[in-house]
Amino acid sequence: MPIGVPKVPFRSPGEEDAVWVDVYNRLHRERLLFLGQEVDSEISNQLVGLMVYLTIEDDTKDLYLFINSPGGWVIPGIAIYDTMQFVSPDVHTICMGLAASMGSFILVGGEITKRLAFPHARVMIHQPASSFYEAPTGEFILEAEELLKLRETLTRVYVQRTGNPLWVVSEDMERDVFMSATEAQAHGIVDLVAIENTGDSA
């Protein structure tokens, strides 16, 4: 039986009694955001709205975006990326589990020097896909042109934010390229790999 979204106690400043709130609402108050699903318009709008709201609330405190996503739609992903560049606070990106396709694009969009992957995380990049086979000929041509523009946009961003030459990024985007956390660091997609806490006491 599904338990739904867990709830945790939260006491607002000046209040004596705590109230039970959705765990994500509680974490949002600490400026911690989560992309834990496929990228679509709904989650994109939620994250964009949260980033804008938290910037209005305090434009000096950093934001933290945790990513575990198989990818998703290109335009909603670009909306998240552009908002990350637009807001005043630095946006840390943290890859846990998988950041694939648009997930890796959002990961690379974090503030340079503040992009991190957990030790066993996986990252995958590739070119944007399409539903060509469903489109009539005229729409097919228009969609192919638009897809080419989107590919150029994504490639340019990866080049700019990883420091890799155009030919390397272009070659990688020809197919699905999976990377470990350390490989993603070497590739310039993340800056740091988290160190496992062994639990040893000093």
From Swiss-Prot:
Keywords associated with the record: Chloroplast, Hydrolase, Plastid, Protease, Serine protease
Family matches, as Pfam families: CLP_protease
Highest taxon above the source species: Eukaryota
Residues of the signal peptide: none
GO molecular function terms attached to this record: ATP-dependent peptidase activity; ATPase binding; serine-type endopeptidase activity
Family: Belongs to the peptidase S14 family.
Location of this chain's protein in the cell: Plastid, Chloroplast stroma
One Gene Ontology CC term in the entry: chloroplast stroma
Alphabetical list of InterPro entries matching this protein: ClpP, ClpP/crotonase-like_dom_sf, ClpP/TepA, ClpP_His_AS, ClpP_Ser_AS
Membrane-spanning ranges: none
Gene3D superfamilies referenced in this protein's UniProt entry, alphabetically: 2-enoyl-CoA Hydratase, Chain A, domain 1
Subunit structure and binding partners: Component of the chloroplastic Clp protease core complex.
Disulfide bond sites: none
Name by which UniProt lists this protein: ATP-dependent Clp protease proteolytic subunit
Stated role: Cleaves peptides in various proteins in a process that requires ATP hydrolysis. Has a chymotrypsin-like activity. Plays a major role in the degradation of misfolded proteins.
UniProt-annotated catalytic positions: S101 (nucleophile), H126
Keyword Chloroplast included in the entry's annotation: yes
GO biological process: protein quality control for misfolded or incompletely synthesized proteins
Reaction(s) catalysed by this chain's protein: Hydrolysis of proteins to small peptides in the presence of ATP and magnesium. alpha-casein is the usual test substrate. In the absence of ATP, only oligopeptides shorter than five residues are hydrolyzed (such as succinyl-Leu-Tyr-|-NHMec, and Leu-Tyr-Leu-|-Tyr-Trp, in which cleavage of the -Tyr-|-Leu- and -Tyr-|-Trp bonds also occurs)
Its EC number(s): 3.4.21.92
Primary localization class, coarse: plastid
